[in-house]
């Protein structure tokens, strides 16, 4: 297991509400909570930037973190991430914030301390551009959207 530096920015985290943790031994994501001052109603089409009460420092440039939606919130209630996926760079040290968007048709109440997203560590491979005049030919070539076949 990889070590991850974290700072608690909201004293309710770790006392009133559990610290981010893996739900099962096979879980890929750590649950992030809505550390709001009070419950908040998110109307249809609205977005809200939600603090998690936590900052992390990954430090290792070979890693990054992704903030991903919780599948149940999206499927059952239409609550997804406003930016679809959040990318946390290894050198970022600020508070983790979650942009929530209600794409559903009904208002949804986000409760204080509710699990709203998950944090997943992923490997990163940085690349440098090698400028060329032409590419070696491939089977696909420049075929774009829908080029590889239907369904």
Curated annotation (Swiss-Prot):
Q: Which reaction does it catalyse?
A: dUTP + H2O = dUMP + diphosphate + H(+)
Kindly list the GO molecular function terms attached to this UniProt entry. Answer: dUTP diphosphatase activity; magnesium ion binding
GO biological process entries = dUMP biosynthetic process; dUTP catabolic process
EC assignment: the record states: 3.6.1.23
Q: Which InterPro entries match?
A: dUTPase, dUTPase-like, dUTPase-like_sf, dUTPase_trimeric
Known cofactor(s): Mg(2+)
Q: Name the residues that bind substrate.
A: 70-72, 83, 87-89, 97
Entry keyword annotation includes Coiled coil: no
User: Which branch of life, at top level?
Assistant: Bacteria
Enumerate the UniProt keywords alphabetically: Hydrolase, Magnesium, Metal-binding, Nucleotide metabolism
A cellular component annotation (GO) from this entry: cytosol
What is an example of a Pfam family matching this protein?
A: dUTPase
Q: What class of enzyme is it?
A: hydrolase
Q: In which pathway does it act?
A: Pyrimidine metabolism; dUMP biosynthesis; dUMP from dCTP (dUTP route): step 2/2
NCBIfam families named among the record's database cross-references: dut, PRK00601.1
Q: What is the recorded function of this protein according to its Swiss-Prot or TrEMBL entry?
A: This enzyme is involved in nucleotide metabolism: it produces dUMP, the immediate precursor of thymidine nucleotides and it decreases the intracellular concentration of dUTP so that uracil cannot be incorporated into DNA.
Q: Which family does it belong to?
A: Belongs to the dUTPase family.
**Name of this chain's protein:** Deoxyuridine 5'-triphosphate nucleotidohydrolase
Q: From which source organism is this entry?
A: Pseudomonas aeruginosa (strain ATCC 15692 / DSM 22644 / CIP 104116 / JCM 14847 / LMG 12228 / 1C / PRS 101 / PAO1)
Task: Write the lineage as a comma-separated list.
Answer: Bacteria, Pseudomonadati, Pseudomonadota, Gammaproteobacteria, Pseudomonadales
- Which gene is transcribed and translated to give this protein? dut
